[in-house]
């Protein structure tokens, strides 16, 4: 009997989906054979095919959102925004392909010209995460297909149903089944796909641990594209502001949206000491009011569960470790539903901790650090090996200029949350957050490579110096055409 993969709803524990584990060798071989024909299609054909995909997503938006909500546990309202992002990605990617990888031709004298064009890599593997199981892999798949690549897509083993639905919608729009392949399986299947000699590159969104392993694996293969987006230990700095209420809202959005399961969520609140008491009280009061419930509950929750009990257990343990090492609890993280991975927002002051762990705590847990000076705030913001997202709340234009110039991150915001980045801009980080292959609008860059050409419609050449004359008696300088 073939091995199977099962998927369960985080909110209820009920089985949602089951499917057979894929044969990686077979799927890669199919994609490799298919990509030359797909690449040979005009780009207008490929883009129109994907525009039909966007229409299919819109036509099935409510059912798709319901599936995302059930398999991830995120509130239905949030799942709807994810579906909207999936549909919107097509037009954004078409524009990005035209702007980031244009064909250019420069005419020269005597019929000579130079040109720059772009080619697809071939068969690309995509490894998707569970937190945005449609939007984030779609952000790799759509630009890869527009550029003329074939794709072998492995969704997270925690959200295979959404991945399968995404592929179904792409196929129904006219993307050939051979060009886009779905690989179902667990971590071993992902490792087999990443190591497969038949792929020409891998596009990854996930944890730093997995991303670092992939980086080591691909280090000896410079001919293969590797694009990594690996999360962050993101700081949000709160400075001089009289609008404590709005500042608190921005902080809560940054820390607890998606139950803290966004790579761009704030993990650390760095706050001016003289502002801290009033601001923290407002943040705690607002966090107390957040509804944590089933994704389809009425009234609608702000947060659903985290992805599974293993994740919830790890976050609870991390909160206890921070407490035992000197952290002062501002708001306890609790498990309100026995046996299910619901977590209430946790807030803890770690200012006096001698050594704070530099890890991505992927859930609704916010650490508070008090500082005296703005220079200390920037130093604390940069006190991490990650570098994805950072935000300044309050301050002045001059302070923001200082923050922007010195904060080490790929996304730097002012008076906006750390999360909710626009797909019309690049999205990526430095350090342990990525390998300088930003996604979103810049995904086009890693889906094709540039080819420079010198061209002439007719044979035209000369050797101007260093030739003997035909009799071999002397050197001549005249040109032989």
From Swiss-Prot:
GO terms for molecular function: succinylglutamate-semialdehyde dehydrogenase activity. Its EC number is 1.2.1.71. Keywords: Arginine metabolism, NAD, Oxidoreductase. The active site is at 229, 263. InterPro entries: Ald_DH/histidinol_DH (IPR016161), Ald_DH_C (IPR016163), Ald_DH_CS_CYS (IPR016160), Ald_DH_CS_GLU (IPR029510), Ald_DH_N (IPR016162), Aldehyde_DH_dom (IPR015590), SuccinylGlu_semiald_DH_AstD (IPR017649). One of its GO terms (biological process) is arginine catabolic process to glutamate. It is an enzyme of class 1 (oxidoreductase). It catalyses: N-succinyl-L-glutamate 5-semialdehyde + NAD(+) + H2O = N-succinyl-L-glutamate + NADH + 2 H(+). Gene3D superfamilies: Aldehyde Dehydrogenase, Chain A, domain 1 (3.40.605.10), Aldehyde Dehydrogenase, Chain A, domain 2 (3.40.309.10). Pathway: Amino-acid degradation; L-arginine degradation via AST pathway; L-glutamate and succinate from L-arginine: step 4/5. NAD(+) binds at residues 206-211. Pfam families: Aldedh (PF00171). Transmembrane segments: none annotated. Catalyzes the NAD-dependent reduction of succinylglutamate semialdehyde into succinylglutamate. Belongs to the aldehyde dehydrogenase family. AstD subfamily. This is N-succinylglutamate 5-semialdehyde dehydrogenase.
């Amino acid at each position: 009997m073939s091995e199977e993969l099962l998927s369960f709803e985080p909110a209820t524990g009920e089985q949602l989906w089951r499917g057979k584990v894929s044969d990686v060798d077979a799927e890669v071989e199919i994609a490799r054979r298919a990509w030359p024909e797909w690449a040979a299609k005009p780009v207008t054909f490929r883009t129109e095919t994907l525009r039909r995909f966007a229409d299919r997503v819109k036509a099935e938006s409510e059912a798709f959102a319901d599936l995302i909500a059930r398999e991830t546990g995120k509130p239905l309202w949030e799942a709807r925004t994810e579906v909207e992002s999936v549909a919107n990605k097509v037009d954004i990617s078409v524009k990005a392909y035209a702007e980031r990888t244009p064909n250019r031709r420069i005419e020269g004298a005597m019929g000579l010209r130079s040109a720059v064009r772009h080619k697809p890599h071939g068969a690309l593997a995509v490894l998707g995460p569970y937190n945005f199981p449609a939007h984030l892999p779609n952000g790799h798949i759509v630009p890869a297909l527009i550029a003329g690549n074939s794709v072998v897509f492995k969704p997270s083993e925690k959200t295979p149903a959404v991945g399968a639905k995404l592929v179904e919608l792409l196929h129904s729009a006219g993307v050939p089944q051979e060009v886009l392949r779905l690989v179902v399986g667990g971590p071993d299947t992902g490792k087999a796909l990443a190591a497969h000699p038949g792929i020409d590159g891998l596009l990854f969104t996930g944890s730093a641990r997995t991303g670092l392993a992939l980086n080591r694996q691909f280090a000896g293969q410079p001919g293969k594209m590797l694009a990594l987006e690996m999360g962050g230990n993101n700081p949000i700095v709160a400075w001089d502001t009289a609008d404590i209420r709005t500042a608190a809202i921005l902080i809560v959005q940054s820390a607890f949206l998606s139950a803290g399961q966004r790579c761009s969520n704030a993990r650390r609140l760095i706050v001016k000491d003289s502002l801290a008491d009033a601001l923290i009280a407002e943040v705690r009061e607002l966090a107390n009011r957040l509804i944590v419930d089933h994704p389809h509950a009425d009234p609608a929750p702000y947060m659903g569960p985290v992805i599974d009990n293993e994740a919830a257990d790890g976050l609870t343990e991390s909160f206890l470790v921070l407490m035992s090492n000197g952290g002062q609890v501002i708001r306890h993280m609790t498990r309100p539903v026995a046996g299910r991975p619901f977590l209430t927002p946790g807030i803890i002051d770690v200012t006096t901790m001698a050594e704070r762990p530099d890890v991505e705590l992927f859930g609704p847990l916010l650490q508070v650090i008090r500082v005296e000076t703005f220079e200390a705030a920037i130093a604390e913001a940069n006190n991490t090996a990650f570098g994805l997202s950072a935000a300044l709340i309050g301050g002045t234009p001059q302070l923001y200029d200082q923050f922007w110039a010195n904060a080490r991150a790929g996304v730097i915001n002012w008076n906006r949350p750390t999360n909710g980045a626009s797909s019309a801009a690049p999205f990526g980080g430095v350090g342990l957050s990525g390998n300088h292959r930003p996604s979103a609008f810049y995904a086009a860059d890693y889906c094709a490579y540039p080819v420079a050409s010198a061209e002439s419609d007719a044979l035209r050449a000369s050797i101007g110096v260093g030739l003997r004359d035909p009799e071999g008696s002397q050197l001549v300088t005249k040109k032989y055409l």
